């Protein structure tokens, strides 16, 4: 298992990916219906028909006379649903309001769950609720504990070497035989 900081970084990366995917879904599959204007505020947002569209003509200097507008290009013919689905350049059809709302709730729930995972990982980071002095004290305690464990390890290594030498003598005795040279065995012990 990875350490807490690695898990936290992974969760943050996943959260960023989820944000990107959520925004992508919402902008792709929304029906883009106009927002309803508040009834108590007249002209809160101008109707789209009143907003002039950007001109494709080159910019004209401020003092120059404005040329007359040519007739707008004829509207494009409506394409059939099968033709629109076959063209990869067209955006996909929006989801039904029910499906869109369901998926929107699911995406929001996923974002909340990931955010809660991140909060949990942050809460279990060491030192979150302790002062600098307490953290330094804890580090000194851990250093002392580490020294003790290291001394135990070195003692076990010495014991292992002693047992290894004893085992070599026993193996030598077996090699010499039970009734062989007992003087060698007595001398080594």
UniProtKB/Swiss-Prot annotation:
Residues in coiled coil: 127-170
Residue ranges, annotated region (Disordered): 50-102
GO molecular function, one term: transcription coregulator activity
Protein location: Nucleus
Main location: nucleus
A GO biological process held by the record: regulation of transcription by RNA polymerase II
InterPro entries, per the entry: Med7/Med21-like, Mediator_Med21
Family statement drawn from the similarity comment of this UniProt entry: Belongs to the Mediator complex subunit 21 family.
Subunit annotation: Component of the Mediator complex.
The protein's name: Mediator of RNA polymerase II transcription subunit 21
Source organism (scientific name): Aspergillus clavatus (strain ATCC 1007 / CBS 513.65 / DSM 816 / NCTC 3887 / NRRL 1 / QM 1276 / 107)
Gene designation per UniProt: srb7
């Amino acid at each position: 298992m990875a350490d807490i900081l690695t898990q936290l970084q992974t969760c943050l990366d996943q959260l960023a990916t989820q944000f990107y995917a959520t925004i992508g879904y919402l902008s792709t599959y929304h029906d883009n219906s106009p927002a309803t204007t508040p009834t108590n505020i007249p002209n809160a947002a101008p109707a789209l028909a009143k907003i002039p569209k950007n001109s494709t003509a080159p910019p004209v200097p401020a003092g120059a006379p404005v040329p007359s507008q040519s007739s707008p290009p004829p509207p494009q013919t409506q394409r059939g649903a099968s033709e629109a689905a076959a063209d990869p350049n067209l955006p996909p059809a929006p989801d039904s309001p029910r499906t869109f709302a369901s998926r929107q709730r699911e995406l929001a729930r996923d974002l909340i769950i990931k955010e809660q995972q991140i909060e949990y990982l942050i809460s279990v980071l060491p030192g979150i609720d302790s002062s600098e002095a307490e953290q330094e004290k804890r580090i000194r305690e851990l250093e002392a504990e580490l020294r003790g464990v290291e001394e135990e390890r070195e003692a076990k290594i010495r014991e292992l070497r002693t047992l290894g030498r004893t085992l070599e003598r026993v193996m030598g005795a077996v090699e010499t035989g039970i009734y062989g040279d007992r003087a060698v065995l007595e001398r080594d012990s």
